[in-house]
């Protein structure tokens, strides 16, 4: 498929049960001359990411669902998710350990220096690999790694042995790395060619000073929210634009992450990346997630990253037809950068323009203009990528968002006029919901609470339109609520309520900053 795409057509194709989910440019004839051939080497060997095919039916990824699930197309081997995704936690839930259990996120970690735990872990993972081989799977093809990664928790053992290991390596990752190396030695002896995967994540992202991972260890480094530091959502993960030392109380700077990551790359034979910098909580207050993508993946390419697990919370199957946002475009760009992180400026912009045209026709240019405006309306400096770790208002330029609200509305009104079909028009209106949420939030204090009669009337007009649109489309207004279960109702809306407060009220996650929607009091 990629051969035909690159050499013959600009067609988009997504295999689906219904015929209307195909998108192909009109073509009466495609000439395929004899002897045509092509060889390409992707930037990253492993390219299978979470949400590789969007659940949103307006989105047409340039790949077929049928091939996205094959190991050969995405680089031989299990997905990064399976290769380093809290394997010890799953082993505990399977009853592998006599004295350790892990039932939910946040439960205590095991003692990684405990001899009984190590013995039982070895028995469990060896048996797991033996069972896979017995079923006919081949190391290096159907599977390449065994997942011995830590459970999803920041509550680590503080026994004498673990603390001694931490002191010796001057790194919290020491006990986990020691355990991983033991498992790696076992696997190297019994199953040559098999990788052993660990996480550098949520308490273990700091590399050790002395001990290095065995040659068959894959380190999955997570650009995430750690115990004492947070990823900056405003700058590239290369850390070059962030301050060396965080200026907020959360430790927000990509400089620290970049330095840790580069050291893991230096001491490890293979590094994969968990990529988190996309919209998460309070998703209706959408922030730009495309402005740093190119720099991020060039950075990863320079340091020889093997592959990725893309972790984002917006373009998900359960949002099907209920949310259009910048993250959908971001996911597509990521898929293309995984194949070629070195495309030219012309190629990069052409790729985006082409994709936006497929989604929205001529309207796509206006929607992309809005996406670029989002980046220009964000606050300066470093701020956390996930809203639950910050004040969403603190990452916005409130004044610019408020003052440009009418401009943004006009972008979408024009986009509706140019929509080539009823489906595209619906998609444009759905995409406008996040714009209205952002603009109403920024305008509430100055235009409604303290505005003139004319300003209040205009705010009321816009708010009423948005309310009706959100209910009519069952817009996925907040995580865990709204479109996914069809619960968004007219009674959920109250014009006297700050739109940010409504978003927080309907969300299943909350910010660590209380009453962040009262930005004028902060």
Task: Describe each region flagged by the PLM.
Residues 180-206, 271-280, 308-313:
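Aromatic-lined carbohydrate-recognition surfaces of secreted/lumenal glycan-active proteins
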Residues 1-178, 188, 262-286:
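Feature activates predominantly on carbohydrate-active enzymes
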Residues 166-186, 214-233, 300, 333-343:
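Acidic, His- and aromatic-enriched active-site or binding-groove loops in soluble protein domains
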Residues 332-522:
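Catalytic domains of carbohydrate-active enzymes that cleave complex glycans
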Residues 109-119, 126-127, 134, 240-365, ...:
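Structured mid-domain segments that build the active-site/substrate or prosthetic-cofactor binding neighborhood
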Residues 197-231, 284-291, 317-329, 434-436:
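Substrate-binding cleft/loops of secretory-pathway carbohydrate-active enzymes
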Residues 48, 143-147, 195-197, 216-220, ...:
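Structural preference for beta-strand elements that scaffold enzyme active sites
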């Amino acid at each position: 498929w990629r051969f035909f795409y690159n050499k013959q057509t600009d067609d988009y194709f997504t295999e689906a049960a219904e015929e209307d989910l195909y998108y192909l440019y009109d073509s009466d004839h495609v000439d395929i001359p004899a002897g045509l051939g092509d060889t390409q080497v992707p930037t990253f060997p492993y390219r299978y990411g979470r949400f590789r095919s969007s659940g949103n039916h307006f989105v047409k990824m340039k790949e077929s669902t049928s091939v996205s699930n094959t190991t050969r197309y995405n680089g031989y081997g299990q997905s990064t998710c399976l290769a380093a995704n809290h394997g010890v936690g799953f082993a505990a839930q399977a009853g592998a350990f006599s004295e350790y259990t892990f039932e939910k996120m946040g439960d205590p970690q095991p003692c990684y220096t405990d001899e009984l735990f190590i013995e039982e872990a070895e028995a469990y993972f060896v048996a797991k690999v033996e069972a896979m081989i017995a079923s006919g799977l081949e190391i290096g093809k159907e599977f390449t790694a065994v997942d011995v990664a830590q459970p999803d928790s920041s509550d680590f053992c503080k026994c004498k042995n673990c603390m001694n290991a931490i002191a010796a390596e001057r790194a919290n990752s020491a006990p986990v790395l020691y355990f991983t190396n033991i498992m790696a030695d076992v696997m190297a002896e019994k199953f040559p060619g098999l990788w052993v995967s660990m996480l550098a994540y949520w308490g273990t992202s700091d590399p050790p000073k002395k001990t290095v991972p065995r040659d068959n260890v894959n380190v999955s480094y997570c650009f995430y929210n750690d115990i004492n530091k947070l990823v900056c959502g405003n700058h590239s993960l290369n850390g070059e634009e962030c301050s060396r030392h965080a200026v907020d109380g959360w430790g927000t700077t990509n400089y620290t992450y970049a330095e840790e990551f580069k050291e893991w790359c230096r001491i490890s034979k293979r590094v994969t990346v968990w990529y988190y910098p996309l919209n998460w909580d309070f998703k209706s207050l959408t922030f730009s997630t495309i402005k740093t993508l190119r720099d991020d993946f060039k950075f990863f390419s320079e340091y020889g990253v093997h592959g990725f697990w893309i972790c984002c919370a917006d373009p998900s199957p359960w949002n099907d037809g209920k949310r259009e946002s910048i993250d959908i475009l971001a996911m597509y760009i990521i898929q293309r950068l995984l194949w070629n992180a070195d495309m030219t400026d012309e190629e990069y912009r052409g790729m985006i323009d082409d994709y936006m045209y497929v989604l929205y026709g001529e309207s796509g240019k206006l929607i992309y203009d809005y996406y670029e405006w989002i980046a220009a309306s964000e606050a300066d400096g470093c701020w956390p990528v996930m809203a639950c770790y910050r004040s969403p208002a603190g990452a916005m330029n409130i004044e610019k968002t408020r003052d440009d609200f009418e401009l943004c509305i006009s972008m979408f009104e024009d986009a509706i006029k140019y929509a080539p079909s009823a489906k595209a028009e619906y998609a444009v209106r759905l995409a406008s919901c996040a714009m209205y949420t952002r603009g109403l939030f920024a305008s509430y204090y100055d235009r409604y609470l303290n505005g003139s009669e004319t300003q209040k009337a205009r705010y009321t007009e816009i708010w009423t339109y948005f309310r009706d649109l959100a209910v009519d489309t069952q817009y996925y207004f907040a995580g865990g609520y709204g479109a996914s279960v069809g619960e968004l109702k007219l009674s959920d809306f109250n014009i006297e309520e700050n739109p940010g407060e409504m978003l927080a009220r309907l969300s299943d996650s909350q910010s660590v900053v209380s009453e962040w929607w009262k930005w004028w009091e902060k």
